[in-house]
Amino acid sequence: MPSRSTGTHAVTSTDTDRDQDGDHGPQHRFELWAPVAHRVLLELDGAAHPMRRDPDRPGWWLADAPADPDRSRYGFRLDDDPQLLPDPRSARQPDGPDGPSQLVDHRAFRWSDTPWQGRSLPGSVLYELHIGTFTPEGTFDAAAARLDHLVDLGVDLVELLPVCPFPGSHGWGYDGVSLWAVHEPYGGPEGLKRFVDAAHRRGLGVVLDVVHNHLGPSGNYLPRFGPYFTDRHHTPWGSAVNLDAPGSDEVRDYLVGSALSWLRDYRVDGLRLDAVHALVDTRAVHFLEQLSAAVESLAAGTGRPLFLIGESDLNDPRVITPREAGGLGLDAQWSDDLHHCLHAALTGEDQAYYGDFAVRPLTGLARTLTRGWYHDGRWCSFRGRTHGRPLDRQRTPAHRLLGYLQTHDQVGNRATGDRISAGLDPRLLAAGAALVLTGPFTPMLFMGEEWGAHTPWQFFTDHQDPALAEAVRTGRRREFAGHGWAPDDVPDPQALSTFLGSKLDWTEPHRKPHADLLAWYRTLLALRRAHPAFTDPRLAAVHAEADEEQRWLVLHRGGHRTAVNLGDEPRLVPLGAPARATLAAFPATVGAPDGASLLLPPRSTWIGRT
């Protein structure tokens, strides 16, 4: 049996033969960490089995019992509590988070992706999607049937929003509570494996969004078993996950084991770690270092490249600095600064955290494209303090930062979930896309962005607890009332119409102007593959210049240029060297350069070589 540090399940199949009568299946060892319990009972397929303490591991309980490795249902009863509790390391919750657990034999799935050698992050383009709203059906199988669209688009990695179980049928996924299992309405463990297998057959890698900083408010039974949470620290979700208090060794192993299971048992290629700035850890070896080392070890064992992407709002280079250089060892992180610069420059919005970026948006955009972050130790009015730290442009590869025009957060956390594409001129959308896809960072698209989807992506929930549902509903309306929104204008998260209205409309890409924008995205992705300058990792080699009053910006990638005019007047834009070729333009009527300058029409984009 593998050690727990490599992510073994609490339920593992032994190599013993079937019982003599052949009716009860092979012996399984059931393991449970419940350090505060005095007695633990395993209930397996209706039969009770007392568990014994593990003499070698304090707090652990063991039981060996015959079970069907892919069908048996089970749970645990602690002391005199009559409630049957699901396994914290359950691989399947067929009846949801509140029901019994079910064994899953990961070895039984027949993979067809044997030749798959993995997909590295450098040079790749990610596509973020939510299983429940990507298709009308909202399942893994339905999403797999749309993968050819992503192949034709030209992306490399599909990033799934969280898929762990949560109460109800639909939600964003960030209220998951069974961190080793898969949401049944999506298709359960088998459905996720079929999706990954289908993606790999098409040459697409898969990234999974995982949440370690909190669990959902309903269906979370971990505190019944042990000190999974601590009051030493507090987060926006309440008590912090216990990463540094007594008992934290086991909690950290629990989270690392969950992460490794996705990479090993489901053959996922990378993980996106939600809000790592909320992982409060005062220990000498940070949890992220431990996780990074474990993933690196698994990658060496499997022969596949595996990677970790963090969501961090710290603007701290340590997050993406290798462990051997004193960093936390993540391979990349999201860069909200680039999004905020683009959003402010394209829309003119200046509320809340857009304020600093809207003062001189094109200057800020040029700064961010060349330095990695806008706030790199500068004053941040939204926080009321200085924020961030400079990146070492000579040592930090640009692909360690993700750049994007839309994300689930930046769309869904708006009051009405309206996309930037719902009201913005397609020519401006095309300019924003060009700066992301020819820019220095690892690009990421949000589902439907490629055709300028007009459908919103709103905040939706399906909480089964009426009190919790009402608290979420009133809390969201109260939040946006502070920004001037009337309560009736904020969609009800619990309304089925909010969820259904957030699904993509797959007829849009066949109509104008959506079809033209989709063709532009395909052109940009093809250019990125064909011209190594656009994937050059040297951040120090990136140059950008902008004119705030005339509303133009030119991005230099070696001998390549991306020039955008965001204004309403034609502008003569300097290219810095005579142009030799036009590679792409939007709209197509943009004229050819005249030597080292280019007359750009209003709201237009030109990409070429000098």
Annotated model-derived regions:
Residues 33-39, 569, 577-579:
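Short proline/glycine-enriched turn/loop motifs at strand-loop junctions of beta-rich domains
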Residues 34, 70-71, 593-610:
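C-terminal beta-strand-rich structural cap/linker in extracellular carbohydrate-active enzymes
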Residues 580, 586, 601-605:
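Tight coil/turn sites that cap or link beta-strands
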Residues 114-121, 130-301, 307, 319:
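Substrate-binding/active-site clefts of carbohydrate-active enzymes
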Residues 288, 292-485:
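Conserved alpha/beta catalytic core and glycan-binding cleft of carbohydrate-active enzymes
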Residues 563-567:
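Asparagine-centered strand-capping/turn motif at beta-strand->loop junctions
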Residues 374-389, 445-446, 451-460, 482-560:
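Glycan-recognition and catalytic regions of carbohydrate-active enzymes
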Residues 1-29, 48-50, 55-128, 135-138, ...:
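The feature marks proteins involved in alpha-glucan
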